[in-house]
Amino acid sequence: MATPQRLTDPEIQTALGELGGWSLQGNKLHRQFKFANFNQAFGFMTRLALVAETLNHHPEWSNVYNRVTIDLTTHDAGGITELDVKFATKANSFAD
């Protein structure tokens, strides 16, 4: 599979405008999700793990009780790509 192309700054800003709750931290998309309890947070991560495998694109993430923090970047491309935007979009849809 070819390495995806890194998005330009205007493309990243457009994506952020469409991705509620996400921000830019360095060269990563960043968001913290809050759930009612640990079970919901872990269930969210489990569903997203299947997406990560399907996309062959794995997040930097952590879980503390009812919070899940996600940072997305494509290391091979040296920044944010469409894969990161796809993953963030899916994360938002699972959190709603």
Curated annotation (Swiss-Prot):
Disulfide pattern: none
Membership in a protein family: Belongs to the pterin-4-alpha-carbinolamine dehydratase family.
Record flagged with keyword Cell inner membrane: no
Keywords: Lyase
UniProt name for this protein: Putative pterin-4-alpha-carbinolamine dehydratase
Transmembrane segments: none
Matches recorded under CDD domains: PCD_DCoH_subfamily_b
Signal peptide bounds: none
